[in-house]
């Protein structure tokens, strides 16, 4: 499994759903994730919660799936934490060049909560942007759309 770093930005919106809390956050992911072959529905487990930082609560977690792992950093409210499993759906990818001429890939994905050991189910709909697009190509973009 490859490892990537995902950084969640501060633009976090949350609302309650029948499964718990739905959190909408944009985040950035390295190009390694593009090389993985995604399935339409894939389970991930988020664990290894480590509080960090002084502004709000910054947490790190490990995102584990069949195809790849990610170390996630997020600044969230103190009660939004715990080990839980999500399905990932609706992955789309678009290649583009940023204002500095760097090749990037924008991804969108929907995470649906399955369970939470801390009693808080969290689902996320995220905007992902590749911040390190080494090795990224139209081919890998197509495979990520899968």
Language-model-detected regions and their locations in the chain:
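OB-fold/S1-family single-stranded nucleic acid-binding modules
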Residues: 82, 87-137
């Amino acid at each position: 499994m490859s490892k990537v770093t995902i950084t969640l930005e501060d633009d976090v919106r949350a609302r309650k759903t029948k499964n718990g809390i739905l959190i909408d956050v944009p985040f950035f992911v390295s190009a390694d994730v593009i090389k993985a072959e995604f399935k339409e529905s894939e389970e991930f487990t988020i664990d290894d919660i480590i509080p960090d930082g002084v502004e709000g609560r910054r947490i790190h977690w490990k995102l584990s799936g069949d195809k790849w792992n990610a170390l996630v950093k997020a600044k969230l409210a103190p009660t939004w934490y715990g080990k839980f499993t999500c399905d990932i759906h609706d992955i789309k990818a678009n290649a583009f060049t940023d204002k500095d001429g760097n090749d990037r890939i924008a991804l969108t994905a929907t995470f649906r909560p399955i369970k939470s050991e801390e009693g808080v189910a969290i689902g996320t709909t995220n905007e992902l942007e590749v911040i390190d697009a080494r090795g990224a190509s139209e081919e890998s973009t197509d495979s990520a759309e899968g």
